[in-house]
Curated annotation (Swiss-Prot):
<comment type="similarity">
    <text>Belongs to the cytidylate kinase family. Type 1 subfamily.</text>
</comment>
<dbReference type="GO" id="GO:0036430">
    <property type="term" value="F:CMP kinase activity"/>
</dbReference>
<feature type="binding site">
    <location>
        <begin position="12"/>
        <end position="20"/>
    </location>
    <ligand>
        <name>ATP</name>
    </ligand>
</feature>
<dbReference type="InterPro" id="IPR027417">
    <property type="entry name" value="P-loop_NTPase"/>
</dbReference>
<keyword id="KW-0547">Nucleotide-binding</keyword>
<dbReference type="GO" id="GO:0036431">
    <property type="term" value="F:dCMP kinase activity"/>
</dbReference>
<dbReference type="GO" id="GO:0006220">
    <property type="term" value="P:pyrimidine nucleotide metabolic process"/>
</dbReference>
<keyword id="KW-0963">Cytoplasm</keyword>
<dbReference type="GO" id="GO:0015949">
    <property type="term" value="P:nucleobase-containing small molecule interconversion"/>
</dbReference>
<keyword id="KW-0418">Kinase</keyword>
<dbReference type="Pfam" id="PF02224">
    <property type="entry name" value="Cytidylate_kin"/>
</dbReference>
<dbReference type="GO" id="GO:0005524">
    <property type="term" value="F:ATP binding"/>
</dbReference>
<dbReference type="InterPro" id="IPR003136">
    <property type="entry name" value="Cytidylate_kin"/>
</dbReference>
<keyword id="KW-0067">ATP-binding</keyword>
<protein>
    <recommendedName>
        <fullName>Cytidylate kinase</fullName>
        <ecNumber>2.7.4.25</ecNumber>
    </recommendedName>
</protein>
<dbReference type="InterPro" id="IPR011994">
    <property type="entry name" value="Cytidylate_kinase_dom"/>
</dbReference>
<dbReference type="GO" id="GO:0005829">
    <property type="term" value="C:cytosol"/>
</dbReference>
Amino acid sequence: MVAIAPVITVDGPSGAGKGTLCQALAEVLGWQLLDSGAIYRVLALAAIHHQVDIQSEDALVPLAANLDVRFVPRKGKLSVMLEGEDVSNEIRTEAVGNTASQAAAFPRVREALLRRQRAFRVAPGLIADGRDMGTVVFSDAPVKIFLDASAEERARRRMLQLQEKGFSVNFECLLSEIQERDYRDRNRAVAPLAPAKDALILDSTSMSIEEVIDKALNYAKKILSIT
């Protein structure tokens, strides 16, 4: 019998620090990394590159099923590779975001991408970053982590990120946007944002990223008997 590669799922709301934690875990353990939040954007960009009709579910399904995408952590930064090309910046454009929203509306496209995400589960293991990784995509994962933080702290972090990039931002507006997104994510009909019953819940509100990584790594090593 072939052993199934282990998975560490990291779910949680936007701005809790999932991306940073997952990149650190992938680099330390030498495992594969899946950024599920970027998958639809990568599909949208592939559709644009290959001139696939974004309104056609029939045309998008095979593209989704065979999507050539990799996530490569490099010294604290994540490179998103589509067909061997780094598209980390390109997938963040408004045009790609709008196209991604249209693609996500098709049930068969979602199903194809679900199977594509599960295909990332290869040896020696996978770190899966998302919102329903531990509850839906990899519900049998041996290690599940739910990373949370207060809406105020997540808004503060986001404000600092944007200010570092030279943007002028309003804290109250950011906080309102985060609270609205939280409400949508936690109350949606399909796969609402919630910790898996067997997940370790980490509240990073008052923790440094080093503390979060240390706690998550020690927990994972204990469960997986990694020294």
